[in-house]
């Protein structure tokens, strides 16, 4: 539809008047040319965002894992073998239902070998909850393992997220999902059961897997942040950071970055056929790709 009433669209559409245009991802550069004929003769510079690259020792990684495993036992009652995270904004383009699809397949596979996993989704649609409210929710009903509608707990997009997560947890025994609707990670932000001294850096260092299978993402810094501590980072093929990874590794295989392609079809389809796909057909495509991602993660 018409987006001319949105200030951001209006500004971008006039960017051809600037002395230079920079795009943070390959797809974004292509989209700029798609905006209009004014961009046909403009050179658009590809300038990827930066990714944190602090050195992480094995001791730091093991310490982070130990703290997150202890915390999981405190709130869920078991010690997970596989630690997964997704730190993001609570918007639909982040594709968080795909996380649950992959976890559904992992649950079945873990049931066969006795392993257990946990996924921590750290996102907030209601700002930062203060320590007093955090302690109250933790004591009253075990937040963030459980939730209630209404501030200081679930508000806005967090409500729909929990509507997906709650039935998932009820139906799965080997992978559970924790929705931490908060900014930051420490005892005053997440609760007294967080091990003393644990920070967001420890959460990053602990992750075996970081999800970021967005439906649209100009770049995507967050999905690659745990890469330096050894996590497998799962992104989608529309994420601009995928082009960044390809340039860094010079086209060589990168075992720690797994690219999900949710446009992968089991047979060639024409444009009209794709446009007229039913919801059931689209869901089947997503399910098949999520199963492939789960299989790749366990290779």
Which functions belong to the PLM regions below?
Residues 1-299:
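Catalytic cores of nucleotide-sugar-dependent glycosyltransferases that transfer UDP/GDP/TDP-activated
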């Amino acid at each position: 539809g018409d987006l001319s009433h949105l200030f951001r669209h209006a500004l971008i559409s006039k960017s051809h008047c600037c002395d230079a245009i920079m795009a943070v991802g390959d797809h974004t550069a292509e989209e700029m040319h798609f905006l209009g004929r004014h961009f046909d003769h403009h050179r658009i510079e590809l300038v990827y965002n930066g990714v944190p690259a602090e050195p992480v020792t094995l001791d730091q990684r093991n310490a982070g894992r130990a703290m997150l495993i202890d915390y999981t036992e405190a709130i869920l009652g078991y010690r997970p073998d596989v630690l997964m995270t997704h730190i993001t904004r609570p918007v639909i383009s982040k594709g968080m239902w795909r996380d649950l699809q992959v976890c559904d397949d992992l649950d079945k596979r873990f049931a066969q070998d006795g392993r257990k996993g946990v996924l921590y989704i750290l996102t907030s649609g209601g700002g930062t909850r203060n320590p007093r409210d955090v302690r109250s929710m933790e004591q009253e009903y075990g937040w963030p393992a459980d939730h209630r509608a209404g501030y200081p707990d679930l508000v806005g997009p967090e409500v729909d997220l929990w509507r997906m997560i709650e039935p998932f947890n009820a139906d799965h025994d080997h992978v559970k999902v924790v929705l931490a609707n908060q900014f930051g990670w420490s005892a005053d932000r997440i609760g007294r059961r967080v091990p003393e001294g644990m920070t967001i850096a420890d959460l990053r260092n602990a992750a075996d897997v970081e999800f970021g299978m967005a439906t649209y993402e100009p770049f995507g810094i967050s999905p690659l942040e745990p890469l330096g501590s050894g996590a497998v980072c799962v992104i989608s093929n529309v994420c601009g950071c995928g082009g960044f990874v390809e340039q860094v590794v010079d086209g060589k295989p990168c075992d720690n970055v797994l690219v999900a392609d949710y446009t992968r079809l089991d047979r060639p389809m024409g444009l009209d056929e794709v446009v007229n796909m039913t919801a059931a057909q689209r869901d089947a495509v997503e399910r098949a790709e999520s199963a492939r991602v789960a299989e790749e993660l366990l290779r």
